Curated annotation (Swiss-Prot):
Keywords: Cytoplasm, Hydrolase, Nuclease, Ribosome biogenesis. GO terms for cellular component: cytosol. The lineage of its organism: Bacteria, Pseudomonadati, Myxococcota, Myxococcia, Myxococcales. Belongs to the YqgF nuclease family. This is Putative pre-16S rRNA nuclease. Signal peptide: none annotated. GO terms for molecular function: nuclease activity.
Length: 137
């Protein structure tokens, strides 16, 4: 079974995939946002290519655990993504995922400019790995 990780941003959507047997998430691609229909179609194409059986969307909670506008955006997007993909979609707390993604990319020696195109997909991998780790026995 493969799971798709989604980091939903206002400009870009990061995507990652994990094989649940290997329990390791990896960044796949970044989708530049257009219309919601085009965004959903692009995500669905990746989901088909990787034969995913579920998806996890990052829920950007505030540090105190409350929900702001971005969290409401993710909550609204998740059911539409579920309908587009035809697989279950879960929300997962993504606090500090972008910070962790930037840290990982810096550790690989990428400059801020090089990170720009990869940070969203890496953040999706951070979210997905957190979800996998939480499910670990």
């Amino acid at each position: 079974m493969r799971t798709l990780g989604v980091d939903l941003g206002r400009v870009r959507i990061g995507l990652a995939v994990a094989d649940e047997i290997l329990r390791t998430a990896r960044a796949v691609t970044t989708v530049v946002r257009r219309t919601e229909a085009e965004d959903l179609a692009a995500i669905a194409e990746v989901a088909r290519d990787y034969e995913v059986t579920r998806a996890v969307v990052g829920l950007p909670l505030n540090m105190d655990g409350t929900e702001g506008p971005s969290a409401r955006l993710a909550r609204g997007f998740a059911p539409r993504l579920e309908a587009a993909l035809g697989v279950p979609v879960e929300l997962f707390d993504e606090r500090l995922s972008s910070f962790e993604a930037e840290s990982r990319l810096r550790a690989r020696g990428l400059s801020a400019r090089e990170q720009r195109g990869q940070v969203d997909a890496e953040a999706a991998a951070v979210i997905l790995q957190g979800w996998l780790d939480r499910r670990a026995p």
